[in-house]
Amino acid sequence: MKDEICIFCKLANGDIPTATVYEDEYLRAIMDAAPANKGHIIILPKSHAANIYELEDEYVSRAFVLAKKLAVALKKLTGCDDVNILQNNGGAAGQTVFHFHVHVIPRFKDDDCTIVWKPTSYEDGEASEVAKKIAELL
């Protein structure tokens, strides 16, 4: 269902004009208005969900299948070296618009776009223990 005050719902459902790359009954992919690099695309579900936790699995699957197709198209069109496919869930993860969306960003070896974190490490056996606990929750 569409949220009447959500800007991304309005973009996804055509209430605000956009440069649309792709559209079907579930999704709209548009050019990002403030791109990290030229060719930066945002995939938006037409149904409102704040994050991946709320989004129906079919929408998640369709969004990431489309992300792959867009990545291939961007490499052909832009000649980019690689592509980032990004999706943030919640403020602590960097989400700023609370409507699920996927960024598809063409990357070039010498561009100014950075995605950085400070690596940490596990104690001996800790990774296996965490993996087991996650698997139990699936």
Which residues make up each language-model segment?
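HIT superfamily nucleotide-processing domains
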Residues: 1-138
